[in-house]
């Protein structure tokens, strides 16, 4: 235990909480380049082939980001916009790719929840 004199000389540092999306460096989104696009299996009890991409961000981090929606056009060297938000059944996936921005096209034939998949309002 430190003495009073030691505490005066060097005050105690508060314990800082770890950020949930450190790779974004406090920004709402970050641009990045796909290094690899592949599928992974979710944790039990779920079963699927979830589409993910390994993305090298402008902040220097290389992260794994989820590709939401049905079907995508992403491949290696695609430029994407990444936001925070984990995928509960994929361990280590703490980011999502924004559909309809940069090289990631919007989901086709989407009628509901369009804003989450970059789909414009359909013409009447």
Swiss-Prot record:
<comment type="subunit">
    <text>Part of the 30S ribosomal subunit.</text>
</comment>
<keyword id="KW-0694">RNA-binding</keyword>
<dbReference type="GO" id="GO:0015935">
    <property type="term" value="C:small ribosomal subunit"/>
</dbReference>
<dbReference type="InterPro" id="IPR012340">
    <property type="entry name" value="NA-bd_OB-fold"/>
</dbReference>
<dbReference type="GO" id="GO:0009507">
    <property type="term" value="C:chloroplast"/>
</dbReference>
<keyword id="KW-0699">rRNA-binding</keyword>
<keyword id="KW-0150">Chloroplast</keyword>
<dbReference type="GO" id="GO:0019843">
    <property type="term" value="F:rRNA binding"/>
</dbReference>
<dbReference type="GO" id="GO:0005840">
    <property type="term" value="C:ribosome"/>
</dbReference>
<comment type="similarity">
    <text>Belongs to the universal ribosomal protein uS12 family.</text>
</comment>
<protein>
    <recommendedName>
        <fullName>Small ribosomal subunit protein uS12cz/uS12cy</fullName>
    </recommendedName>
</protein>
<dbReference type="GO" id="GO:0006412">
    <property type="term" value="P:translation"/>
</dbReference>
<dbReference type="InterPro" id="IPR006032">
    <property type="entry name" value="Ribosomal_uS12"/>
</dbReference>
<dbReference type="GO" id="GO:0009536">
    <property type="term" value="C:plastid"/>
</dbReference>
<dbReference type="InterPro" id="IPR005679">
    <property type="entry name" value="Ribosomal_uS12_bac"/>
</dbReference>
<dbReference type="Pfam" id="PF00164">
    <property type="entry name" value="Ribosom_S12_S23"/>
</dbReference>
<dbReference type="GO" id="GO:0003735">
    <property type="term" value="F:structural constituent of ribosome"/>
</dbReference>
<keyword id="KW-0689">Ribosomal protein</keyword>
<keyword id="KW-0687">Ribonucleoprotein</keyword>
<comment type="function">
    <text>With S4 and S5 plays an important role in translational accuracy. Located at the interface of the 30S and 50S subunits.</text>
</comment>
<keyword id="KW-0934">Plastid</keyword>
